[in-house]
Amino acid sequence: MSLYKNKKVVVTGGSGFVGTHFIQELLDRGANVRTSIHKTPLKIQDDRIEVLENIDLTKLDDAMKLVEGVDFVVHCAGYIGHPSSIPTDYQIGLNQINVITNVLEACYKQGVKRFLDLNSSTGYPDRRYPITEDEYWDDEPFISYYSYGWMRRYREKLMEHTSHLTDMHIGIARGTAIFGPHDNFDLKTCHVIPALIKRCLSGEDPFVVW
């Protein structure tokens, strides 16, 4: 039997690329899924999805409302900027911290049993060889993602601290160059792999990899 069968599961960031896939997978496994809409509509429509509208996770009251009465939370929400803006966009980092802090506090207060965070590989140091997970904290984050990478590291320490103080089971997935259906393929704002796919399908000739 699926761990998620008949469980109430919240997916934050359910209108985003990765959140969309989590919702579909959880529905397929028999979960009762709840998500929220802040600015962007959902990419999939299914009557089995409970949708709360106008939820702003930078506000603790909204986070409390979203996770009330649920068993598990899959946290995919975040403020995303174009890669070129990450080193300098102070507001992106601040909002990310506000969101994770509010969601974790809400989960603790509402008695959520399990919490999965979709984090990022931007916290890893710069290496000229295939890096391992154990090297995450060995050096400073890569300079192009320096402040953003430290924010991502802070998230993990915050979750580690929370797991020590509560009974909540917390897992972290460090996403690396994720791509696929429902991704952003706008060449002005997308990441490297979606851009390469879009350019390849458009018949670019010669095809130049940056």
Enumerate the predicted regions with their spans.
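N-terminal Rossmann NAD(P)H-binding glycine-rich loop of SDR-like oxidoreductase domains
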Residues: 8-29
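Conserved glycine-rich Rossmann-like NAD(P)H-binding loop of the short-chain dehydrogenase/reductase
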Residues: 31-39
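Conserved cofactor-binding/catalytic machinery of classical short-chain dehydrogenase/reductase
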Residues: 59, 98-102, 114, 154-155
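Active-site YXXXK catalytic motif of short-chain dehydrogenase/reductase
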Residues: 96, 148-152
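NAD(P)-dependent short-chain dehydrogenase/reductase
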Residues: 127-129, 153, 157-210
